[in-house]
Structures are given as C-alpha cells and as structure tokens.
Amino acid sequence: MYETRWTTNEEITIMADYWYRMASEMEETDGIPKPELHRVEEVKHLFVKESNLGNLMFRVAIDSNDNIVACAGGLIRTEYSYPLAEEQSLFGWVIAVYTLKNHRNNGLAYKLVDEICLWLKQKGAKRARLWSSSTGRRVYEDLGFKNMMDMSKPLS
C-alpha cells in the first residue's frame, strides 16, 4: 500500500510544512511552544541549504495515489559526542518525523527512521540523535534509541 523513496529537490520545501505540523502537535501533546509561521520560511531555507550541501536527506512514504503521507529527515553534523570530549565527530540527527493522522499505525515512521539511520551511517555518523514527542517515544525505543542524560529547566 505504501512505498518509500528519497525526496526530490522540489519536495524539500514541502518537508518544512510537515516539520511545522510535527512541531504543532508537540505543542498539543508536550507543551513545546508552537513555532510562529515565519519560522516555516526559515526552516524551508535551512532545509534547501543543507540539502544542497549534501548534509540533509529526507525519506518519504507515498500512498497509492503518489501523495506524500509521511517523512523523516537525516541531518549530518559535526559535534562533541559527550561533555569534555577532545574531538568532534560526525553525528546524525533524525529530524521532522511526521505521519499524516489518517496514515498512522502502519509502521511508516519506524520504516522511514530506520532508512534514515542507514543513510546517516553510510555518511559516517557514529550515532544518531533526535528529539521525541511523548507519542513518538516508543517507535524510537523500538529502533534502539536510548534516553540520554539531558536535563532542562525553563528559566522564564
């Protein structure tokens, strides 16, 4: 019923819309502040830039009518892998994982994230990270993602 594939260059900007939908739902479920609409344009430009540099790729699931119904992105970054690490290493970030509501519970997020992790590994990343909503946590745990020692405190 579904197929997965890489996005085309023309579809990269559509991924910013899916990112906005994901972020909006995180506001509803987890209280994460909903991004302002102007942020979508900034994210579009960022996605195009990083895609053109070869640092960002998206996998999408399409339905039988060739409509994009789910996506997941992979972003390569150089970062310190842990506090006080002497050298930076390649890290993969899984970003903008989103499935349209009427296509959920079909394993699409799992499949797309798994495919993105393979791409990140092929690009040289030693570890993949992501920020998860409470509703998506189980999918990522099933893929082998673990909680890290990150803590936060609102200061306002």
Describe the residue ranges of each PLM region.
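Conserved GNAT acetyl-CoA-binding A-motif
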Residues: V113, L120-S132
